[in-house]
Amino acid sequence: MVSPSSDNPAIAALLFSCVDAVGIIADLANFFAERGLNISRYEEYTDDGHFFSRLEWPLNDRWEDEAAFDKEFTAMAQRYQASFDVRFM
């Protein structure tokens, strides 16, 4: 992980995709809200029945690395049979 500075705070970015369904955005938002995290940037679109999103949040000490995030997030992603990728920057 890149060390944060006051000019360049550390952030994480999540790419998430699955078949479009009701409740995806709410579940993504709730996942972060329940952990006291603020989504600082969010983009989403649908194409041919598939949902795609990218979101960012400021890093804190909740997860030490991407693998720790993956372990906690996998259950949420499995609800939608989603694929996801996270990067700590």
Q: Where would I find each of the regions flagged by the language model?
A:
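A conserved regulatory-domain signal marking ACT and ACT-like small-molecule sensing domains
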Residues: 1-89
